[in-house]
Amino acid sequence: PLAGFFSKLFVFTACLQSSLYFLTFIGILLSGITAFYYIQIIKIIYFGRLNFWSIYIPIDKSNAVMISITTLLLILFFADNSIFITSNLVSLNIFHFLK
């Protein structure tokens, strides 16, 4: 649970050392907003009561498979290639660093 905290701390520290004060301010502001919403979700889970009943309609297995395949094809063929190129470069840099 503390990995996210320390990673944000290191990013904010690097921004401050690079004199990117506005970016640091925006990051801290957005972290505070997201923390508020996460705390609200936890509060509802542990202390809230449902005011309504939800009805969940199960999806057939064939429909679930079709939705999964369609989503996968859309991501693989219509997503921007820069995402895959960036992840490939990062993995190569990590491999080169460990070698």
UniProtKB/Swiss-Prot annotation:
Topology in membrane: Multi-pass membrane protein
EC category name: translocase
Recorded GO MF terms: NADH dehydrogenase (ubiquinone) activity
GO cellular component: mitochondrial inner membrane
Broad class of where this protein is predominantly found: mitochondrion
Segments crossing the lipid bilayer: 22-42, 65-85
Protein task: Core subunit of the mitochondrial membrane respiratory chain NADH dehydrogenase (Complex I) that is believed to belong to the minimal assembly required for catalysis. Complex I functions in the transfer of electrons from NADH to the respiratory chain. The immediate electron acceptor for the enzyme is believed to be ubiquinone.
PANTHER family referenced in this protein's UniProt entry, alphabetically: NADH DEHYDROGENASE
Full protein name: NADH-ubiquinone oxidoreductase chain 2
Originating species: Cyanidium caldarium (Red alga)
Gene assigned in the entry: ND2
